[in-house]
Structures are given as structure tokens and as C-alpha cells.
Amino acid sequence: MTSVPVISVVGSLNVDHTFRVSRFPEPGETLTALGAEMSFGGKGANQAVAAARAGGKVRMIGCLGNDERGREYRARLEAEGIEDSGVLTVGTSTGAAFITVDRKGENTIVVDSGANHALTPKMLEDSAFRIEESAVTLLQLECPPEVVEAAAGL
């Protein structure tokens, strides 16, 4: 019997607001979207969801805001089977991304890092055992660089 690999993800959790447009607006122009949707994203959380859906035992490490979006996000992680005890709730807003996608599939993204930038190397120390017990740790650069460096060193 093969054991399920433990995968830790240290990274971002954003609420994505995606707008489909016929073209990108010019500076100062207001453009009506062809459609819009809200989804749970962030490069770190996207990695965690993909790994969990592929059959891995996933541990997410990051920060969510003390707001309704953060609570909704935590429920989403649990629904995906992602262990979230390494996700801290902090006194700021949950990260958000505003994504514009044109008909060709090109995009522009504006990110409000919010709670993602509250994660510190000191906070990461409390999750060191999660990383050390993992077969692999996934990182990206939507958290402070010093956090990524600290996680890579564990």
C-alpha cells in the first residue's frame, strides 16, 4: 500500500474578482464588463487545491483576514479537504485580486495583498513541523520574500 504524500503550501489566499471585457479600458475610461465572477484564488491556494484534487494530503499555511470573505474561504479549504490549522486569521482584510480578461484571454491583475502580507517568519515557526513532515513544500512569491526564504530553509 502506498502512503499519500503530505504536501505543505506556504502562500497566498485571495478572493478573485474576474471581469470579462471586450477590450481593456483606456486610462480614465469606464468600460462595461461582459460578465463577472468571484472565486477563491491566490497562487498558494490554487496550488493547494490542485494538489488536494490530485490526491495529496495538503496542509495550507498562510493568513486570512478577520472578515466574511476569510470565513467563507476557510470553509472552502475544508470543503476541498485541505488541512487549514496553519492558516491564521489576522486583523486585516483577506487578500483580493481584481482580474480583467479580454476576448483573446489576455489579462491584467491588480492585487491587494491584505492578510497575505501579515505572514511573518516568526509566525511560520509555529508551522515548522508541518513543513518538516512534508514530502514537498510548495512556495510562490505572493507572500513577503522573507517568509518564502524562511520556508525554503525548513
Question: Over which residues does each language-model region extend?
Answer:
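Glycine-rich phosphate/adenosyl-contacting loop at the front of the ribokinase-like
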Residues: 1-63, 68-72
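Ribokinase/PfkB-type carbohydrate-kinase core domain
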Residues: 1-13, 59, 63, 71-89, ...
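Short acidic/glycine-enriched loop/turn segments that link adjacent beta-strands
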Residues: 92-95
